[in-house]
Amino acid sequence: MAVMNGGRATKRARRSNRISADLYDFSTFPTAEINGESTTLPPFRDGVRTFLATHARVTFPPSTLFSSLMTWQIMLRPGDSTDGSDLSSKLVSLDVVEEDVTRSSRSVYCEHCCVVGWSSHPVCRKRYRFIIRSGGDTKACTRCGNTQNLSEGSNCKWCSMALDIENWVYSQLEDNTHLLHGVIHSNGYAHLLCLNGREGGSGFLTGRAIMDFWDRLCSSLAVRKASVMDVSRKYGMDYRLLHGITRGCSWYSEWGYEFKSGSYALTKEAYQSAVDTLSAIPLSEFLFQGRKPRTQLHSIISFYQSLSCSELVTVKDLFSFLLQMIRENSSKPASKSSVLCAWSKSDVERVQQTMVKILKASGRPQANWVTRWALKRSICKSASPQLIDYCLKHFGGVLVDDGSRVVSSRCNPGSNDFEYRLESVNNVHRLSNQDVNNASVEHVKQDLRYLYETLLHPQTMAEFRSRATREKMIDAATKILDCKHFIKDYLSSTVNPVAINLWCCVELSDELKESPAPPPERLVLPLNATVSDLKIEAAKAFQEVYAMFKRFEVEELLGYGSIDDSITLKFLVGTNGVIRIKGRCSKHGLLRYRMERGVDNWKVDCKCGTKDDDGERMLACDGCGVWHHTRCIGINNADALPSKFLCFRCIELYSKKPKQSKKERGSSQVPKAGFVCRGESAAMGSGSNLSVTLRVG
């Protein structure tokens, strides 16, 4: 029986490996070769259809239940298994939701486009959402409470109650616990909405692996631009602030995402200046306190300065060293033979023997802990400070008394200093498995959080000796935190060498020239295409991409005068370039799709210089209707909104008017009917989640 069971188990393992071998590898999928386009890529509107038809399968629910959504699924394997383990629990499911905006019962506008500068784009007909869920595709019945897989039918198999599948699917689009959630409009503009690595609930996919996958996906589908709102968290802290001062940029910059414009009208130059300013603050600003008692901040900084092999001078040096210690997993012992030493072996042994004598003297009648600071002070005249620091760093684990005793060390969380004492070898057998010369990872994370709250975060920053330095640090940190939007431009230099490749710009004859034009669309035509073929292909492209262009017709090519439609296009424009066309489209019933910002004629003119929605909380003036940042008018984000608000311009105009009685003027606290803050109305209207927390790990 044992042999038979073992044999069956082996067969099942081989079968599992054979099935998973047919799946694409998550770490390499998708690639240009997989898509069959090793040199050129079609426009996104065409490439996404080919991608889904080639790699995905239509999943439940079918489009007959609700015509606005179509769901697809692609199964991937995270890597090859070499130990025969069951890979079914380690498969990655990529769900693709194709949303027809014109048939959707939800908001047709994209709030994410509005806050990154794409608010003037026409509403796209379709959105493609790429989701890797952290949980399974199960739904709980509202009547009996039992859960079942969605592929098992639209009725509960326990009580036969009809399940609201459409509502469940839409709720998934608003969930911020997904490991990955990205949306790509049919014009090729994309948003990364959600990314959660191991700290965000991922079992085996790291944040970096997920980000690599998203970047490859965008590249292979010929995405034009992709945005991300960097609100990522690491170790419970704002990672854009930590990564900004240690690397000089956002974590997403490693994949080509660049800062374009920030909230509160911040520019790229202001962002870089803030990063440079905060990174270069010298640690000496916090160490010299005159006759004041030694603080916890002073102890922590001195502690890590003594641990580092290189000199820690600035804020950047300090935080970079702590993050490096966490990454390198300080509990793992380092090989002392690989450490380059500037001193001879006899010099090191001489200093360490002196320290051993001090430990022996302090250990009578019982072994007492001696701090690193006390040891350094006791032998400061016998060797250079650099040699003493080196010997202390490698002091833990030194054998004495013919190997019967050993130097034991620990990190005291109360004093943030190392302590040493002599112990019997039998009591410290664990030293062979861990490096006691370094603080534990959890201890370093605890110190990192303390330093972050004391030195970096503007709301919790401590008082320093120099008030000017503190104000400068608060200003720089606030600017870094205000810069959340980053964009990557996927510039494609590859063109089809056996076709005509044109960027087609459109101008509507029934609109003013000042009206915003849609982004140009890329057209790929055969070499023998005529002007007539160009008009047909251009009309088809814009009709497929934008809802307002449903009845779009091309009238003429601009810049070429009156030309015959039968002229070969290659002789007119060549095989590459930009062409402008003029057309007309009946907008009857389609005006709501004119721009992603919606049909409301709202205006932003804040004193900080902001002229458009940037995703921050705003308030409209009850006098002129112009929107202003609540923070810029003195209202903190945590404070309640006033029932009535007048901007500075209206107050100035009001003060110049003849005075009225109190009864006519009315109270400034009278509520305005239907009053809603812009930040809140945008969130309610779009159903989107702009403040999603991204956790990388």
UniProtKB/Swiss-Prot annotation:
Q: Which UniProt keywords apply?
A: Metal-binding, Nucleus, Transcription, Transcription regulation, Zinc, Zinc-finger
| UniProt zinc finger (PHD-type) residues | 603-653
Pfam families from the xrefs? PHD (PF00628)
Q: Is Iron-sulfur among the key words of this record?
A: no
What is the protein named? PHD finger protein At1g33420
Gene Ontology MF terms: zinc ion binding
This protein's source sits in the domain of life called Eukaryota
Q: Where in the cell is it found?
A: Nucleus
Location (main, coarse)? nucleus
One Gene Ontology cellular component term attached to this UniProt record is:
nucleus
